[in-house]
């Protein structure tokens, strides 16, 4: 069977569509945001492919797998088992790293366990048990005629006179010993000082190196090893030549340090055998950070320099009063004027010094108690450790920072694992390399003999996996990078690389915009990877808006014509040529150039006197970057993946602005020297792709603030007033108006164990969330439930006479969200949709013209036509005097910017510098900028 037949697909907004999709081809599904692409790719094809495979398993196995809901479709045939690679499922497990997700780390553990060389942490001597034959051979390799003596260490760095030891050695027939580095006669040994440490080594044999000494040396070594418990030393009899220490034990000959046999689990930070005991393999330690605990060092303790310990908190302030009396300091003096020692006592405690504390209870009785002062940081730590209250924990988390573990230095591994080497390189050193550097290391790694044979297969697996990661544009990441810190696009491409590593055949892969966060330069490699997956014999379905991906596809499906209720139909399908020739295809019109996003004829000029200057940003891979952002312009931050854009803008620039303009207390900017020019703004707004809410109770109406005036309208109707209903009656989050059977959720979750959890509409309210009495109240003929079911477009028409609601709905339409429902659960919105809901909320607020907006890849999930709408909105914000800073790879956005700041030249350690800045026309001329190379043709 060479095709997949879909008949009557009605999932979500799909309108009973029929499709024939070729198998073993690269298929791109494109169309407007919200047109139904994901409904077709993920909720129909993937869901059915995965469901059929899981259903073939036993009931016992099924209970461990989440079975997907059966899609609303009449018939699908020709499906393979399906694997989806989405952006959403970025791991939040602090133990997941790039190395563990891709399994490279598992192979590295195996490699180090099998061919690694353990060394003593203190003396850096290889730990290797040697046979007597090996010891003899080593001595015979010395220059012929060299005079050597064989020593057996008897006492090592121990105090005492050791008279008995020396007598015993003489009684056994030994003539000489080396005591504290000096050779002496045992018939007349020196008197040793009782309280000094001494080392005694008995001379077992003295030889001139010759080839016929094998037997004699072997016997002498046997004697020496027996005397010393496994250690022997060969030392020159004359001069200061090098000594050779031999060990018959798997231990350091100098200090006796030994370790168990090497096993892969010793190198796992997720296993007690390998994890650092201090941080349990997390690599970081949490601590209460004085910088977060001290709210404002310019205030006094009485005024609230430390929140919760001011005059308002009577119990804690009593303690500080007693402390101030004891140490004679002023509670009304600014905290930063107190001496360092006093500040230390307040934060870390008085140690063993007891202080007389005066406690006054509610009745006014005074009680005196003597005890040391615990210290504010220790008090917070104890409360955090002992509390069972989530709210207290959440409050205290604000004051916690993390730092690299003091024991393992952030490597996550115990001492033994950190001291195993392959060619002078440890495992922690390898995982700190970028993937590109790690690939070079293993490509040039030379092992010899048996070790080379053992390592051959493991090295091939490591090299293959590293190469796949390079192919999907992730050469700048390092293997120790925590999965939590990856962007959606990076996480998706890592899973893509893992799948290629698996080398499966006959599978249907479904991908969701794998080009997110990729620079045009890396896009080509990604497309080669996708075609490689196809060439292995797989069907590759990609939901994508990227022009290169659409042109590269064997088969294109264009869903539309509009979004939401106006979409859900197949507008065009076939080869690239067929799409271009189809007059109904909006995608085809943009690809053929019939429609295009126009380059502005005139750029907004920059005022050199109005800029924000950030000096010396050095977080992650940034190399003391000086950033200059023009005020009142639309600026684009560009650069290849991993060049430092997010570190510079999100982790440094935004966090500084958030702290200084919005008064944030817990934002910790990456390191920088200084910033000036923030006085041009009154607030900063970061519009990212995180969900607008994590429960079905959050929806666009509640998030944008439309729901409050809607509830007020309903409570103002004649019916509501006669019944005494207030706006709270129309909330599904509080008792009163909501249906209590489902607590306002509209659905009831039924756990089915080895079947998927079933969400059934509530029997009582039939999924409407409200009780019957509330639903009897109508505004213009509609109940509150019917209003929540309206699309933004319908609601805009319905509420046109109500300016406060109509204005907010208009902004949702302006950002291209006319198709979403007011009450649509936040959990069903894509990252791009969530970002645009946030943008709409900000647009609907009163505009001061002094706002700094920061957006990270706002074109994610957007079709060419949606991008046109988004740009209209962003340009409107700029025209009102606001400053818009956008991190973006999309050339249609970059070419319309007023100002470009390009980072690079490469990703990871090869990046972290500003290599070009200016208008798009200026930047396009700059040699050495990858962005310039792709931007130049767009400006013609």
UniProtKB/Swiss-Prot annotation:
InterPro entries attached to this UniProt entry: ABC_transporter-like_ATP-bd, ABC_transporter-like_CS, ATP_grasp_subdomain_1, P-loop_NTPase, UvrA, UvrA_DNA-bd, UvrA_inter
Gene Ontology CC annotations of this record: cytoplasm; excinuclease repair complex
Presence of the UniProt keyword Repeat in the record: yes
Database matches in CDD domains: ABC_UvrA_I, ABC_UvrA_II
Membrane spanning residue stretches: none
Short name of any one Pfam family annotated for the protein: ABC_tran
Entry keyword set: ATP-binding, Cytoplasm, DNA damage, DNA excision, DNA repair, DNA-binding, Excision nuclease, Metal-binding, Nucleotide-binding, Repeat, SOS response, Zinc, Zinc-finger
All copies of domain ABC transporter, residue ranges: 309-586, 606-936
NCBIfam families: PRK00349.1, uvra
PANTHER family on file: UVRABC SYSTEM PROTEIN A
Family as reported in the entry's similarity comment: Belongs to the ABC transporter superfamily. UvrA family.
Role: The UvrABC repair system catalyzes the recognition and processing of DNA lesions. UvrA is an ATPase and a DNA-binding protein. A damage recognition complex composed of 2 UvrA and 2 UvrB subunits scans DNA for abnormalities. When the presence of a lesion has been verified by UvrB, the UvrA molecules dissociate.
Name recorded for this polypeptide: UvrABC system protein A
Organism (species): Vibrio vulnificus (strain CMCP6)
Lineage: Bacteria, Pseudomonadati, Pseudomonadota, Gammaproteobacteria, Vibrionales
Gene behind this protein: uvrA
